[in-house]
Amino acid sequence: MAPPPLELVLELSARERFEMVELRSRFSTEHDESLASYPRCLYWSAHTTAGFLDRSLIARLGPGRVASYIETLRHIFPEGAGYAHDRLERRKDLDAAQRAVEPRNGDSHLAFIAGGLQPCVTHPNRAGEIVCFVDLDGVNDGRPRRRQTRVIGYHREAVAGQIRLKVPVAGHPIDSINLKARSLGLYEELAEFVARADVGKGRLHLSLIHI
C-alpha cells in the first residue's frame, strides 16, 4: 500500500523585487530528501504576485532563457507606470486601514497574468526536473516580503467528482467577475462539493466552458 501524501512548507525571503527560485532543489535541501519516495509532486502558493511557470513553458524556453522571459515581463509592465491598481485613493474595494498597507504593485499583477504564472503546478519528482517559482514583488518599500510555498508528494491522482457552476455575466463582451463575491455563493457551493467528496488531500481545478 502506498504511503499517504506528504505535505511540506517552505518559507522564502527575496533579495530582489523580481526573483526566480528553483524549488525542487530547495525543498530537497531544506527537508533532507523527505520527498524522495514520491514519484510526483504538487507545488502551490496562495500569492497573487508570485507563482510558478507552467512545466510546458519551461520546456519551450529552456532553462537558460527563463531569466530573460521574466526580464521581458518587467519591461512590458514597468514599475510605477500609473496603473489604476496603484491609485489607492480611488479604490472602493479598500478601507482606510487597507489603503495604508496596500502595495503599489499593479505591474506585478499584470506580469503575473500576462506571463502565464500559475498558483499550482504538478511535476514528476525526478533529478533534473526544474520547478520555477517566480516572485514579481519580492521587495516592497525596501523590505523583503516573506513568501510561503507548499509541496505535496503523492503517488497517484484520481478525479473525485465534477460540478458545474453558473456565473452571471453582463452583456458587454468584456466583463470582470469577482468569484469570491458572497452574492454568487460559489465558494459555499465549492465547500459543500469538497465536503461531499471526502478527500484528505486534493485540489480544485476550475475551467470555463462556453454555453
List where the protein language model places each region.
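Mid-chain, well-packed structural core segment of small domains
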Residues: G80-N125
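A phosphate-binding glycine/aspartate-rich beta-alpha loop in the early core of alpha/beta enzymes
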Residues: V66, I70-D86
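Intrinsic-disorder/low-complexity signal
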Residues: R147-Q148, H155, V159-A160, K180-Y187
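Acidic, glycine-enriched active-site microenvironments
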Residues: I163, A170-H172, G200-L206
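C-terminal edge-of-domain segments
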Residues: R126-G138, G142-H155
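Short HxH-centered metal-ligating active-site micro-motif
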Residues: R40-D54, E79, Y83, A96-V101
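Mature, structured domains of secreted/extracytosolic soluble proteins
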Residues: M1-L42, T48-L57, G62, V66-Y69, ...
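Conserved small/polar residues in nucleotide/adenosyl-binding loops
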Residues: I209-I211
